[in-house]
Amino acid sequence: MVVLGIETSCDDTSIAVYDSEKGIPSNVVTSQLIHAQFGGVYPEIAAREHTKNFLPVLDKALRDASITLSDIDAIATTFMPGLIVSLVAGVSGAKTLSFSLKKPLIPVHHIEAHIFANFITKEIEYPFLALVVSGGHTELILVKEFEDYIYLGGTLDDAVGEVYDKVARALGLGFPGGPLIDKLAKEGKEAIKFPRPLLNDEENKYNFSFSGLKSAVIREINKGIYKKEDITKSFQNAVVDVLVKKTVLACKEFGINRVVVAGGVSANSQLREEFLNIKDLEVHFPPMHLCTDNGAMVAYTGYKRFKEKGISVSLDFEAKARCRIDKFPQLLRSFHA
């Protein structure tokens, strides 16, 4: 089965092909560098760029896979969550292809796709704890099976990747901030003991909060006392400490020794090192090229949904800016084609 995967939930236009016999023969990602000058993503600009990039990216994805549209068996696309104007750009393109080619339209949840990007290169046993860390999300999810999810907690304010971007902007490092801070932190030491938000809060043991940490870091930046590399190291130590300890706590309480880390921040070298150093914990990370938003994870997850659940949806199914992953399977059934 050959599935076309479309991802436009934020500022990356990505289209990929998943072939059940060949794997991922193509995965084209066009990043919108125009946002770097603003230090963040502007939705209206993102939507315009998606519309401009869609056909060239589609053409390259097909050429890289050495196929034509007639070889496609189904169209998978990210329907939710994300920037609504960005999502609509991809969903509109997917619906047009589905209608004109008379092929099934398979909906994919953005968080779900990040999690199952880990499955593209290896099989992972259920159940497992998923830690999703990206520019828009910080969530802990118990995955019992595909489409059987228990949402444990998420961020109460800023997502971890968003805070990385804002701290990087305050330091004058550029955008996106995650890789830049990760690189600079390797040269620094922990000169400041920043707060570990909600780390010992029983009522919020699976929730996250990074706005206070962000403010504390920016205050220290504005004082101009410490070196940039020491600030980034101190900041990253606090972030990684919170992410790892809350995940390990959930593993202990649910009796699970398997963790899947997903999302753009899963590329962080210190986060990987801290998790992989934990004894008796099986931790999985996606390949580096599948950490950030990409069409391959959408194509594969769409294939998995169609193969295991037989799910496709009618053209009436609409994109949504918000939808928790545990609510998504039930929502699908009301629009099952």
Swiss-Prot record:
It catalyses: L-threonylcarbamoyladenylate + adenosine(37) in tRNA = N(6)-L-threonylcarbamoyladenosine(37) in tRNA + AMP + H(+). PROSITE patterns: GLYCOPROTEASE. This is tRNA N6-adenosine threonylcarbamoyltransferase. Keywords: Acyltransferase, Cytoplasm, Iron, Metal-binding, Transferase, tRNA processing. Its main location: cytoplasm. Binds 1 Fe(2+) ion per subunit. InterPro entries: ATPase_NBD, Gcp-like_dom, KAE1/TsaD, Peptidase_M22_CS, TsaD. The gene is tsaD.
